[in-house]
């Protein structure tokens, strides 16, 4: 028994379910080797049902990626329906379905899912930490008459767009370029 419980998942839906259980003081159940819940309640170090004081979501970048993958699969199904309605066959159908990608409305859905994650953590009453990889902030500029994406020189969390705006504190950790063993941080 311990006072830390680690759950491995790449599913945003599962993460939101665990946050909901923590918020509502519900029991957690041990996971078997196949990833299925058992009937065995997870216990803390005192033998009581486990109730987290803090939640760590390590990998919003991965959750964002898997969310996008799921929506792309849905987009292919959406394209399949459109191809059926249009009566497409052969290469035309193949291009329509296999070429399906994220549409503008899909990006908005993904961003809402990311905000749901942060807002669920805010409402949980638990301490929380959310990690993300970082990426260069980019802006659109017209260069030689063409619209191009240009780095601003700032680093931002890679993952759900705008998730940092609902967090109380953002810490950017980085290695000192002159001393790789030293980790520094911006708050």
Where do the language-model regions lie?
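Conserved inter-motif catalytic segment of the P-loop NTP-binding fold
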Residues: 1-112
